[in-house]
Amino acid sequence: MPSYLVETFLARDAKGERRLREGRARSAADEMTREGTRVGFEGSIYVPEDELCFFTFAAPSTRDAALVAQRAGLAPLRVVEAIPSGKEE
């Protein structure tokens, strides 16, 4: 299944917000899976200098990755397919 990178804004002074968003992302992915669309939350990467947080999901399509991000309340700036090392086509 492809992986998708969800880019979001996260202010430097937003202590604890990343953990809350990760919990919502995990819950939204679980909910979509129960509804029949297999989605998995893979983790996040925070870049405090740029005030960006990237969330990664395994999902069938860009549309599904965007939907899980929306359900999690992540307010994505963009959603793009990402290919982890070792999985190049």
Report each predicted region and the residues it spans:
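A short linear hydrophobic-aromatic micro-motif
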Residues: 38-44, 78
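An amphipathic, aromatic/His-enriched active-site/gating alpha helix that lines ligand/cofactor pockets
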Residues: 59-85
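Generic detector of leucine side chains in alpha-helical contexts
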Residues: 5, 10, 20, 52, ...
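Short, well-ordered beta-strand segments in beta-rich or mixed alpha/beta enzyme
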Residues: 4-8, 42-64
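Glycine-centered loop/turn motif at secondary-structure junctions
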Residues: 36-38, 73
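Charged/polar, solvent-exposed surface patches and flexible loops
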Residues: 23, 27, 43, 67, ...
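Short S/T/G/P-rich N-terminal loop/turn motif that feeds into the first structured element of a domain
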Residues: 1-34, 47, 85-89
